[in-house]
Amino acid sequence: MQPPTSTDQLQTITDGLNLPPFERRMTLITLSEILHDPVRAMQLLADVAYQVRPHSLAEDSKAVPPPVKVNAANLEQVAAGITDFTVCLLNLNESRSMADKQAFVQELVLSDSANMRVLLSAILKDLAASRETIYVSKFKLPPVIPADYMVDPQIQTLLSQLREAQSRFTEALNQNRDVQKDQILQKMERLATDKTTFLTRRDKLFDRVKQAKALSVPKEAVRLASRRRVALSEIEELKTQINSQNEIRRAALNAAKAVVNSARGTPANILEASEAENKRLKQEIINLTAEITEKESLAHLIQSEPGQEAIELMENELETLRTDLVKYREMVSTVGSPDEEDNEQEKMSFLNQQITKIKTQRAQLENRLTNARRESAEVDAEVAKRCSSTDMASLMKDIDDMDSIPMLLFKNLLSKGRALKPLHKKAMDEQQLLRKENAIVSRTKDILAAIPNLSAEAPDELTDAGGLRPIGGGKQRVLGSIGGVGLNAKNLMEAKAVLAELDATLQQKKRDLAPRVSELAALKRQCAQLEADTESENQRARTLEVSREGSVYKLRLSVRALELEIDNLKTQAIVTDKKAELLRLELEQADNVREFDRLKREITSENNACKTQMMEIRAKQEELKCNLPNRMAQNKLFKSLVSILEFRKQAALERQEDHAAEMRMDKIRITN
């Protein structure tokens, strides 16, 4: 056989490390990196060797130390300790010397060691077999003794005793393996026999149950046929009642449509009423959805409904199966007949429950119809009251002029208007101030334009009703008083100087007021934009209100349609309940519950007995494993005692034969 290559060894190591109890998720690249690092490679070997370390069976219950942590300081020490009990996996027939083991250890601690790959692959190839081999080798392999001590006679004596003990251990081990193999084979044979017995009993029980079902079908078929006819008649009556209720619902729906179309009121009242109606409809839809889910869960029972043809066939076969029915009754009497009175009571209680349920549903439908009629009457009365107390033309005009803005949108616009109110007030104040100053400037220009005419016509006298007075908070001067004093040349020069100063002040004032004028224009544009936005939002709110009313109307129509559909589903659910009742009665009569329970208890008790026997066998096996060395020693001792007793018996027989021969010789001598 060709030895494995390094690639095969690496693949074996990788596969072994990916299996329990390691589960390292190792790859060839990761393993190669680990093997190139001596410390990591030795740590991996220590973890693997920890799973196959030699320990006696008595040490299983004791706490064992965890695997060692490898570092550069204890590298050779750990390698030597692992090599002592794992080297047996490499060559079982060769006893290695101390020098060979030292060379093996020195090569084991190298980077990418071949011995490391060989040792890991040998352990991980079969972990259970490696563990057993190492355990057995602890007792079978001879110890490594230096050659200097081999000449000692005491060492030779101890070695001979060790070889004898190892031979006894090998013999006991082989006997134990034979015993375990025999016990396993016996256990397998016993389990196979038990399985065959149980399968035979199960088949017999199944045959009896099938026979019981076949014999109970004809009698039950007649009863089912009669009950089915009664149930179908009840279903037809229920359909008639539900159709009449649907007609009443349609009338209520038409009345509700008329109320919705004729309703008038403020937008707030309409919105509040619509929200309340929407909440009520949502809750009703949730309740109806739950009822639909409950009724749909019973739809699968319709699939197993017996057809009319099958029932008629059962009725025709009734006469031919009467003899079999007599046999079935005799068989049932041996097992135990079912209590007919209990069955009748159960059927009556079930029918009473179904009748109560149908009455409850009918009462609920009547209550809902009464509530719908009462609400319709209230709405009609409210509409009539409003129409009688209010002029419809003026009411429609007020509704058209009213801003029907939703509450959230109205609050948003109100907050924006409140934020812009201080800016608007400031702009209006500044606009008023500018108007006053503009009037003053216009008046001053008129006065200044009149001054040259006055100086030309009356250079000595100039009268005017106006005058100079400071304005604008003391920041500028204007003409306040021109009159009462004659204008001469000197006064004219002073007036020109004053006018020049006034002109400069006016120009400076215009430059100062230019930003404020532009800001005022921007504020005006912003106010105009805000008014346009408000108008557009109002228009949008009106559109949303109209669309919302249409959506509410459509939602009501869809809810009414769903109610009609739910009524149909209720009808189908009632039909399903009746059919389910028929099927349940058929199943109750067909199944022999008592026989099934008794057989189930018997099978369960037998399974428990088998489990108890298996547990006892396992306990005996564990006890045998623990007491194997002592028993083997006792076996040897008993064999020695038996051989001694046989030798003594044989010696006694030989002495008796010698004594008898001597007696015969004495008789012969006496006779002669």
Swiss-Prot record:
Organism superkingdom: Eukaryota
Family (UniProt): Belongs to the IFT81 family.
Coiled coil: 155-182, 235-382, 492-572
Primary subcellular site in the record, as a coarse category: other
Disulfide bond sites: none
PANTHER family for this protein: INTRAFLAGELLAR TRANSPORT PROTEIN 81 HOMOLOG
This protein's domain notes: The CH (calponin-homology)-like region shows high similarity to a CH (calponin-homology) domain and mediates binding to the globular domain of tubulin.
GO biological process entries: intraciliary anterograde transport; intraciliary transport; intraciliary transport involved in cilium assembly
Gene3D superfamilies, sorted: Intraflagellar transport protein 81, N-terminal domain
Species: Giardia intestinalis (strain ATCC 50803 / WB clone C6)
Annotated GO CC locations: 9+2 motile cilium; axoneme; ciliary basal body; ciliary pocket collar; ciliary tip; cilium; intraciliary transport particle B
Function noted in UniProt: Component of the intraflagellar transport complex B (IFT-B) involved in flagellar assembly.
Protein name, entry field: Intraflagellar transport protein 81
Molecular function terms from GO: tubulin binding
Region (CH (calponin-homology)-like region): 7-139
Localization annotation: Cell projection, Cilium, Flagellum; Cytoplasm, Cytoskeleton, Flagellum axoneme; Cytoplasm, Cytoskeleton, Flagellum basal body
Keyword Coiled coil among UniProt keywords: yes
Swiss-Prot/TrEMBL keywords: Cell projection, Cilium, Cilium biogenesis/degradation, Coiled coil, Cytoplasm, Cytoskeleton, Flagellum
Pfam families the UniProt entry points to: IFT81_CH (PF18383)
